[in-house]
Amino acid sequence: RLIDINSLEDREVPAIDALYIGGGFPETQAQALADNVAFRGALKQRIEEGLPVYAECGGLMYLGKALVVDGKEFPMVGALPLSLILEKKPQGHGYTVLEVTGKNPYYPVGEVLKGHEFHYSKAVLHPSDDTRTVFKVLRGEGMDGKIDGLCRKNVLATYTHIHAGGNPQWAGRVLRNKFSLDSK
């Protein structure tokens, strides 16, 4: 069963088994997202408890520490050690091809993923012992023209919007990850 979650208005994360955070433009709602301290805190707590999360583009931005828009910093969820700085021109725009290079809950190492990206933000990674990049960019920009895909706990967040037709297993892998966690 799919459940809609509104990060602008909801105060808590409902009882869910896994979470997909799609793309969008969080910079257009940065103040409202930052103001919803209760939801941001609840989501971070669920992530720390092991909630499987798959996030694309705007979802990546929302899970970071902060979003900087026109020089003003807005706190985000803080589940990933990066800040995002909004630029005036696109930082990534077009089709992407990624090679999975690091262990993660959703894709085997060596798999090639296809998708697209469109983002005005630039990622600034903060050093962290418990977070790793897991994709090598073969086509596109990702985070810096070379890497994409941050993995921490059961979270995988990427600028790339995966093309479901080109990667039909991705949704099932989110659910399999949840069920494999239940059996541990």
Where are these regions (language model features)?
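Acidic, glycine-rich loop-and-beta core segments that form the ion-binding/anion-interacting portion
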Residues: 1-43
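Glycine-rich, charged/polar anion/phosphate-binding loops
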Residues: 2-8, 63-65, 99-103, 142-145
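Fold-independent oxyanion-binding glycine-rich loops
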Residues: 5, 22-24, 65, 82, ...
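Generic hydrophobic alpha-helical scaffold/packing signal
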Residues: 17-20, 30, 40-47, 64, ...
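Hydrophobic, well-ordered secondary-structure elements that form the walls
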Residues: 19, 56, 77, 118, ...
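Short acidic (Asp/Glu) and glycine-rich catalytic loops that position anionic groups and cofactors
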Residues: 19-25, 59, 153-155
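Cysteine-nucleophile active-site neighborhood
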Residues: 26-106
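Amide-donor transfer/coupling interface in amidating biosynthetic enzymes
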Residues: 86-184
